Curated annotation (Swiss-Prot):
Similarity comment: Belongs to the class I-like SAM-binding methyltransferase superfamily. BUD23/WBSCR22 family.
UniProt source species: Saccharomyces cerevisiae (strain ATCC 204508 / S288c) (Baker's yeast)
Subunit composition and interactions: Interacts with TRM112. Interacts with ECM16.
Gene Ontology CC terms: cytoplasm; nucleolus; nucleus; tRNA methyltransferase complex
InterPro entries from the UniProt entry: Bud23-like, Bud23_C, Methyltransf_11, SAM-dependent_MTases_sf
Listed GO MF terms: rRNA (guanine) methyltransferase activity
Catalytic activity: guanosine(1575) in yeast 18S rRNA + S-adenosyl-L-methionine = N(7)-methylguanosine(1575) in yeast 18S rRNA + S-adenosyl-L-homocysteine
Name the UniProt record assigns to this protein: 18S rRNA (guanine(1575)-N(7))-methyltransferase
Note: Present with 1620 molecules/cell in log phase SD medium.
Amino acid sequence: MSRPEELAPPEIFYNDSEAHKYTGSTRVQHIQAKMTLRALELLNLQPCSFILDIGCGSGLSGEILTQEGDHVWCGLDISPSMLATGLSRELEGDLMLQDMGTGIPFRAGSFDAAISISAIQWLCNADTSYNDPKQRLMRFFNTLYAALKKGGKFVAQFYPKNDDQVDDILQSAKVAGFSGGLVVDDPESKKNKKYYLVLSSGAPPQGEEQVNLDGVTMDEENVNLKKQLRQRLKGGKDKESAKSFILRKKELMKRRGRKVAKDSKFTGRKRRHRF
């Protein structure tokens, strides 16, 4: 079965018919509610917090935010059809049309926390030739870090296509300044396995609740080790510098009895541009 990200950009894939079908499905409503409750458990927030819902769609996760803890929330999404469906449902939160890959357009320190359900995997997909997934991830995490208060928390449930996408997301978050890691629910199950990115933007003010990091299983060091292990299993090697490559090849030619130029301080250096 094809993933939605591979079929079309989100603003096209979630058209009017898909938005109504998605919102009206009781199965989708149940799954979204379950994942939102799990995200709230990981956030460990005080009541009446101000939350940003990233990729809010038609507001299924926003309804849970209102019901659980009387949180005030604001949602953003790239699909006009999804937002129109949400407006027709008279949600209590505010809705905004925005591509999260272009950044979070809010004043610094606006939100106590942020949540995202089944959305950030879209950032890893290049819909057009000018969309670079790594740049979009960095822009997203940098602007999100700024939009959160000091000690603000972010939990995102997402569906990665492969381990490389998990690595890219985690490393972009670390570079932006977030601490935290990955929580995997039901890791042994192929069907029910769920990935939750659990992050915190610095230390919270004294007396406030800490982000719930129980079950965090991956950090930046483990990601790098995992990547190295995959390279070894695939037979891949670490990148070799141009100079060491040339010296190795010259040594090989010498052993084979070929005539080879002597080494000098200029061996392996790039030539200057003449013009």
